[in-house]
Amino acid sequence: MSGKAQIFKQTGVRWLWLALVVFLADIGIKFIVMENMGYGWANRIEVLPFFNLLYVHNYGAAFSFLSDQAGWQRWLFTGIAFVVTGLLTYWMSKLPAAEKWNNVAYAMIIGGAIGNVFDRMVHGFVVDYLDFYWGTYHWPAFNLADTAICLGAAMIILDGFRKKEEEK
């Protein structure tokens, strides 16, 4: 077996399939939203008393961070996503495939990051469509990629606590 095949079989790189699934699901949902929903608040679909589907453009990062800037943030966030994707992929190549928790976390972040980079490169903005609210307060709209990134980051944080508990 070649060295590259062994790396793929025995290391966390094997979990990159999950990043691909997250990426494909993210761009697939965004395509459906763009093709089937009208843009903006007036075209929202009220699903639950605290949740709407809503097609909006986000020129910033997760939860509209820096969306009011002049456009430089598109390139900043794209660069950050490439660096993070490279680092996480490298770390996955050093982790055993059996270490599922961190590999899944890294793959989710990679898939989400690539999904949002795809939007920035193709559209010049990120498509957001999930709108949660309480009363009149609305959390900034977000998408599957943002969700995957946040869940992956939360898993990494939780892993830090798990390891400290195991050491005691």
UniProtKB/Swiss-Prot annotation:
BP GO terms, sorted: proteolysis
Entry superkingdom: Bacteria
Annotated EC: 3.4.23.36
Name of one Pfam family that matches: Peptidase_A8
UniProtKB keywords: Aspartyl protease, Cell inner membrane, Cell membrane, Hydrolase, Membrane, Protease, Transmembrane, Transmembrane helix
Entry keyword annotation includes Membrane: yes
UniProt KW Hydrolase keyword: yes
UniProt GO MF annotations: aspartic-type endopeptidase activity
Alphabetical list of InterPro entries matching this protein: Peptidase_A8
GO cellular component: plasma membrane
Positions of transmembrane segments: 15-35, 47-67, 75-95, 107-127, 141-161
Pathway membership: Protein modification; lipoprotein biosynthesis (signal peptide cleavage)
Annotated membrane topology: Multi-pass membrane protein
Catalytic activity, as annotated: Release of signal peptides from bacterial membrane prolipoproteins. Hydrolyzes -Xaa-Yaa-Zaa-|-(S,diacylglyceryl)Cys-, in which Xaa is hydrophobic (preferably Leu), and Yaa (Ala or Ser) and Zaa (Gly or Ala) have small, neutral side chains
Active-site residues, Swiss-Prot/TrEMBL: D128, D146
Compartments in which it is found: Cell inner membrane
PANTHER family assigned to the protein according to its UniProt record, in alphabetical order: LIPOPROTEIN SIGNAL PEPTIDASE
Similarity remark: Belongs to the peptidase A8 family.
Role according to the record: This protein specifically catalyzes the removal of signal peptides from prolipoproteins.
Protein name: Lipoprotein signal peptidase
Source organism of this protein record: Vibrio vulnificus (strain YJ016)
Name of the gene this protein is made from: lspA
